[in-house]
Amino acid sequence: MTPLGLVWSTTLRCAPLDACTRATAAGPKNPATTEAPTTIVTFPKLFINTVTALPSFFPNTESVAFDSSVSLISLPALSGFSVK
């Protein structure tokens, strides 16, 4: 997680991984004016890092606090993207 939110980037997909590493180390195979398509999607941070006291209907928990930076909603389900 970055300070501004989650950054998801997709570029060229290589398989197997060591073949991708070797191709990257060897340098570009295309002319310098050709670039691989890149998509960057930035998700804003959904929850602010604050601490809020729980309501009084929780018995014997006067000192319990809820940290709103913990999310119970998974990001892929919320955004509609599937992470593979």
Curated annotation (Swiss-Prot):
The domain of life is: Viruses
Question: What induces the gene encoding this protein?
Answer: Translated cap independently from an internal ribosome entry site (IRES). Highly expressed.
Q: What is this protein called?
A: ICP35
Q: Which organism is it from?
A: White spot syndrome virus (isolate Shrimp/China/Tongan/1996) (WSSV)
Gene that this sequence comes from: icp35
